[in-house]
């Protein structure tokens, strides 16, 4: 983190140095242009005297006004730069670095996603979409099962079909009746044998 901070400060410092150099070159170019302008003005002044054009004093006043405006613009730019340092507003270079960092993070995220996708294909791990489809399929099956159960319950109420509990209750008395009949048969058989023995004696 400290290395990144130092790198950012170094880049920012180099950017400011480059900016100051550019401003110095711009000022020199403007001075050269002003000198050329003065030379042209002198030539024009001679024409003005000859043809009655406005004097060079008026152009000088206009040029000084433009120079004052340029100086005010530079002062505003310097004040804005000081505000960025004071309040932590990012400069153009910092914004560029931040944007490049975000782009690198997005690329790394895409690479991780591609690597995960390759692992899924290689080892058969279900992707997020497949898990979602499987979960939705299971939910649909559960809903269909519940609907079938509700439909069966409605049929039982409508047509008098016994439910599982009712079938079990109905089957129990039948079993008791069968046991009772079997017991009666055994009793009759025993007493019949005894009656035959008595008659034989």
Swiss-Prot record:
Residues carrying D-allo-isoleucine: 190
In which tissues is this gene expressed?
Answer: Expressed by the skin glands.
Tell me the Gene Ontology biological-process terms attached to this UniProt entry: defense response; neuropeptide signaling pathway
Q: Where is the composition biased (Basic and acidic residues)?
A: 56-65, 92-101, 128-137
The keyword Secreted belongs to this UniProt entry's keyword annotation:
yes
Location in the cell reads: Secreted
Q: What segments bear the compositional bias annotation Acidic residues?
A: 30-40, 66-76, 102-112, 138-148
User: GO terms for molecular function, please?
Assistant: opioid peptide activity
Q: Point out the propeptide residues.
A: 23-46, 57-82, 93-118, 129-154, 165-186, 196-201
Write the signal peptide boundaries: 1-22
Which positions bear D-alanine (Ala)? Answer: 50, 86, 122, 158
Q: Which Pfam families match?
A: FSAP_sig_propep
> Quick one: where's region Disordered?
26-181
GO cellular component assignments: extracellular region
Main location class? secreted
The protein's job, in short, is: Dermorphin has a very potent opiate-like activity. It has high affinity and selectivity for mu-type opioid receptors.
Q: Which family does it belong to?
A: Belongs to the frog skin active peptide (FSAP) family. Dermorphin subfamily.
State the protein's name.
Dermorphin peptides
